[in-house]
From Swiss-Prot:
Keywords: NAD, Oxidoreductase, Tricarboxylic acid cycle. GO terms for molecular function: L-lactate dehydrogenase activity; L-malate dehydrogenase (NAD+) activity. This is Malate dehydrogenase. Catalyzes the reversible oxidation of malate to oxaloacetate. HAMAP family: Malate_dehydrog_3 (MF_00487). NAD(+) binds at G7, A8, G9, N10, V11, G12, D32, N94, V117, S118, N119. Substrate binds at R81, R87, N119, R150. Homotetramer; arranged as a dimer of dimers. Belongs to the LDH/MDH superfamily. MDH type 3 family. Transmembrane segments: none annotated. GO terms for biological process: lactate metabolic process; tricarboxylic acid cycle. Its EC number is 1.1.1.37. It catalyses: (S)-malate + NAD(+) = oxaloacetate + NADH + H(+).
Amino acid sequence: MKITVIGAGNVGATTAFRIADKKLARELVLLDVVEGIPQGKGLDMYETGPVGLFDTKITGSNDYADTADSDIVIITAGLPRKPGMTREDLLMKNAGIVKEVTDNIMKHSKNPIIIVVSNPLDIMTHVAWVRSGLPKERVIGMAGVLDAARFRSFIAMELGVSMQDINACVLGGHGDAMVPVVKYTTVAGIPISDLLPAETIDKLVERTRNGGAEIVEHLKQGSAFYSPGSSVVEMVESIVLDRKRVLPCAVGLEGQYGIDKTFVGVPVKLGRNGVEQIYEINLDQADLDLLQKSAKIVDENCKMLESTIG
């Protein structure tokens, strides 16, 4: 199994290291446009092998030729939003980056599974799908896995229980448009509504929506990377080991939930072939309305990018 991570920043490097540490790849490529960064980080990771007991071949590179014949490619490359930059500016710049990255990936790998982490997530996943020409089941956005992990973490803090006993369902877009579905959120099988008052649940939902911003506020510079990197690796593990995990991911819908031709976060089965099944679960009307609203925002932004992405 050969896995490539595009972007050697905090998210990309964390993702690459966890893939190596969990022995999910025989060969791992960390690629970045900045000379020396992927080479240095790649070598540092490789030198942990004797301690971590893994033999993954790790290559740091600036050349897409080194990514040839990758089975999985993870795109973390992109710019953060800077002061004075409008959302439209960020969209255009990152769409250009993801377009170029995807074009280069496809020159060297015929049929990879592409996992997109770059923001705005759902829209960048659409860009990667359009440019790659791959079937929708092979282009996946990492969104709900991270959002659900944050929701679970906050519930565990509130109740003082193990995170392992908490299951959470978060659908929709990554960010303000996410839809944490309370009725499918449980603690050891017990509905969260039986354990916490509605106003406390509402506060946890709101904290989940602002989870990324909360970390940015603490850090002052930069954003989250341990939790996004770990969330990507949960997806990679299900694909590589063909575990058939049911995880919330941004995928291209074709009529499910009344949404068509739009990438949005819903529960899917992830296996060796990528998205092997999309689950259309029963939603309350309020949650369905929020999900469709989230999809509409994604669709509008994608239409704005049509001339950019070709």
